[in-house]
Structures are given as structure tokens and as C-alpha cells.
Curated annotation (Swiss-Prot):
Its main location: membrane. This is NAD(P)H-quinone oxidoreductase subunit H. It holds the Pfam family Complex1_49kDa. Belongs to the complex I 49 kDa subunit family. GO terms for molecular function: NAD binding; oxidoreductase activity, acting on NAD(P)H, quinone or similar compound as acceptor; quinone binding. It catalyses: a plastoquinone + NADH + (n+1) H(+)(in) = a plastoquinol + NAD(+) + n H(+)(out); a plastoquinone + NADPH + (n+1) H(+)(in) = a plastoquinol + NADP(+) + n H(+)(out). Keywords: Membrane, NAD, NADP, Plastoquinone, Quinone, Thylakoid, Translocase, Transport. NDH-1 shuttles electrons from an unknown electron donor, via FMN and iron-sulfur (Fe-S) centers, to quinones in the respiratory and/or the photosynthetic chain. The immediate electron acceptor for the enzyme in this species is believed to be plastoquinone. Couples the redox reaction to proton translocation, and thus conserves the redox energy in a proton gradient. Cyanobacterial NDH-1 also plays a role in inorganic carbon-concentration. It is found in: Cellular thylakoid membrane. GO terms for cellular component: plasma membrane-derived thylakoid membrane. Its EC number is 7.1.1.-.
Amino acid sequence: MTQLETRTEPMVVNFGPHHPSMHGVLRLVVTLDGEDVVDCEPVIGYLHRGMEKIAENRTNVMFVPYVSRMDYAAGMFYEAVVVNAPEKLANIPVPKRASYIRVLMLELNRIANHLLWLGPFLADVGAQTPFFYIFREREMIYDLWEAATGQRLINNNYFRIGGVAADLPWGWLEKCRDFCDWFAPKIDEYEKLITNNPIFRRRIEGLGTIETKDAINWSLSGPMLRASGVPWDLRKVDHYECYDDFDWQVAWEKEGDCFARYRVRIEEMRQSLKILRQACDMIPGGPTENLEAKRLNEGKGSEAAGFDFQYVAKKVAPTFKIPNGELYTRLESGKGEIGVFLQGNNDVTPWRFKIRAADSNNLQILPHILKGHKVADIMAILGSIDVIMGSVDR
């Protein structure tokens, strides 16, 4: 008796670019054999706005408001790296107080970034409730940003060459401490809701596993790299700003799956709270109201009027010329390594301004880890990468 052989023709399916689980205008051309993913081709570029070319036709001060439109969840990180590049090329010193203020803003942005990743990721795998909780927490961070910069989500326009645009307002540090005290139990609440939830764990454990060597070879960074057993964090490696002043640990895991990436980001929020608390206590000059009172009482010769107690080294003129030379500078954002390659030619605008977006590099491994998985796993694996298409397409 002859046995009939079942044959299935491969089917090509388009996910996106308008699918709600695509996290922006990403299109995936997926080849399926039944429910198994045979191949996947990401199609990007739908959100290309020519950011690098815009940067090459603007002065640094003019370009800073643009950059938060690339990644609306990491606006402060892009502002920081865009001012760090000309600072290093022109050897402009940054006062200690300004560096602490920058760290406060960056760590608040890291928490906000991870929260905005957490809600949609859980919604992708079927847990709807935490999606509403994360916006409650982000609202507190928005309030802190609004008090310091005047804007909430994007377009903060706060970082400047040599420091920041303005000192912290009165009472800001106390409000930041209140946020830390309020948010710490909320992370425990997330852990109770999610981490040991058997449905959630069965859904994502062992999914989208990336080996250590693959993570390095594909040039992954951030939680994608650290979840695969590589404790690499640019805050420890490059010693930029004043991160060496604080006591904190790099969050990393060995498994390399979606669950490991989730755990890394949860732990990073805890570490960011540790850094925020220490920065609030250790900032040179203390709260702005105390610093201003000390300057007023002690006069011009006051220690509080010294360089390290300023919020900016020297306000850079609109005619500031980027010196001849080239350099690459980078920092650790919530998604990984973001960097700028800057080439100056002694002009007010740069000759070349190349932006390295972390999620752009991290997205490249998606076809490699999707093969062999089920079609229902595509959303969970893509969600664990943390992609925002504004910075991928630039």
C-alpha cells in the first residue's frame, strides 16, 4: 500500500507596514510553510527623513531639537550623544554639576524607555493590563522633565555643548527622590504580576534564543547583548559623564531568550533607581535653592560660584565652529549603543554626521532568530528586540 505524501506550498505573507504589532512602519515579508517560518525579510525605510543630511546643514544648537523625533522613547540619549561629539572634538570641559544633571535626565529616560517597551511587549503576548500601568509611571517622569525642560515626551532641547540649557528648578531633586520612593514598589508589583506568571513564562521562555557568539558577531548591544551572557555596558566601559561616582551593577543574563531580555530590562530599572538616588544626594551644590542662597550670601568669591557648580561651562555662540578632525562617540541608551561619527572642517556645520542607532543594528538579527519558529511567535520575538522605526530609518 502506497502512503500518500502531504505537500504544502510555501506561502508569502506581508506583516505591516501598518500592523499594530510592528512597532512603527516596519514591513516583514514572511515565507511560511504551514505555521512554520521558513524565511523573513524586513523591509525598512518607510520613515526615512534624512536626519543625517539635515544635521550636515544645521549648527549643533539648531540640530538638538530634531534628534528626539528619531526615537521618541530615547530623546535625551540622542540629545546627549549629539552634543558629546563636538564637545570631545573641541575639548570643551563639562562642569561636574552639569554632568550630574545629565545623568539624572538619562537615567529617567532609561526607565521611561523600558516602561514603554514593557507595556506593548506584554500586550503583544496577550497581557493587556500592565499596558495601562506603565503610562501611570511614565506620567511622573513626564512631570519631572516638564519641570526641568518645559517639554514632556520629546523636543526637550535641554542638552547643550558644555552642559545643559538651564539649572534644575527649585524642589526638583526632592520631587525626583519622591518618584524613586514611589516607583521602587511598582517594579515589585510588575514582578508579581508578570515574572512568575506561568502563562507568560510558557509563552516566551526559550523563544528567540541568541547565543553569545551570535550576539557579538551580529554587533548587538544593550539588553539584547547582555541577555546573551555578555556583561557589556558602555557606562562601565567608556567611563563617560560621572557614572564612575556611583555604586551600581550591570544587569545581565545567560539564557539569551525573550524572558532573559525581559529580566535584564526589569533589573536595569532597579539599577537606574539606585543611580538616581545617589545622584540626587551627591550632586555638587545640592538643590538649586541651596546653591543660589549660598552664592548670594558668600558673594563672588564663593566656592558655589566655581566651575564645577555651574550648569554649563560657557554658553556656546551660534557661530561655534566644529574644529577640523573626526571622531566617533557613543553612549549606552535604553536600547543599546547609540553613536555619532562626526567629521568637522572648521565650519559651523559638520562635514559628515553619521548616526548609529542601536535598534537598527539589533533588528538585523530578526530573520536569523525567526527561522523555525511559529508564525504566532513573530510578534513576541520582534517585541523583545525593542524597535522604534524613527531611529532605524532616520
